């Protein structure tokens, strides 16, 4: 409680300077992982945070609800968020997702909330790879089938073209679709 009272009296600029010093220090640190990628690996995700409407009227999204959305682009080489945005809780994940600038040659992993075929085309044009879950009702055509390693759980490896009217209008790029079976749970997953 004594420390809390002392901290309460410090100027906000002190904490801002401390944050930037810590960030600079940790930006150049590397985290050891069990996996290795030659390309920079990023995770992109957004979290919906419920707030008290009586305390945070500025975050009102409905008559009785307040919330905000926190979007983060995490660099896995040092486990530090390189991109952070806080927005209105009603905002679609893609609004901030499109704004993040990933370096060419990197790989970005994101969930199904980031479905935007034009964005996929832009990432591909910038030489940025991505991995996301494949929507099961997606309309596509198989262009080519590749050899698979069933012993590793890979059931299908296909080059596909999304060919729904929506995907064609937004110039969805040619994509790679991987179907995988988790050996422990037996569950099937499809990825782009």
Regions found by a protein language model. Give the residues of each.
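Long amphipathic alpha-helical segments
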Residues: 1-3
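Single, function-defining residue in the core of a domain
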Residues: 5-21, 33-54, 63-192
């Amino acid at each position: 409680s004594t420390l809390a009272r002392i901290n309460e009296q410090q100027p906000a600029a002190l904490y801002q300077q401390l944050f930037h010093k810590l960030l600079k220090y940790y930006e150049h640190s590397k985290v050891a992982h069990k996996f290795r990628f030659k390309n920079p690996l990023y995770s992109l995700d957004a979290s919906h945070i419920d707030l008290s409407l009586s305390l945070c009227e500025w975050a009102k999204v409905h008559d009785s609800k307040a919330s905000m959305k926190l979007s983060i682009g995490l660099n896995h080489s040092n486990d530090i968020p390189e991109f952070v945005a806080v927005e209105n809780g009603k905002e679609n994940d893609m609004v901030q997702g499109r704004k993040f600038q990933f370096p060419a040659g990197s790989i970005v992993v994101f969930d199904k909330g980031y479905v935007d075929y034009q964005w996929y085309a832009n990432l591909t044009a910038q030489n940025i790879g991505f991995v996301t879950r494949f929507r099961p009702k997606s309309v596509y055509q198989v262009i080519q089938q590749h050899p698979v390693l069933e012993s590793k759980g890979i059931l299908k490896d296909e080059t596909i073209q999304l060919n729904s009217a929506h995907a064609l209008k937004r110039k969805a790029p040619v994509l790679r679709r991987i179907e995988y079976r988790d050996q422990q749970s037996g569950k099937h997953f499809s990825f782009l």
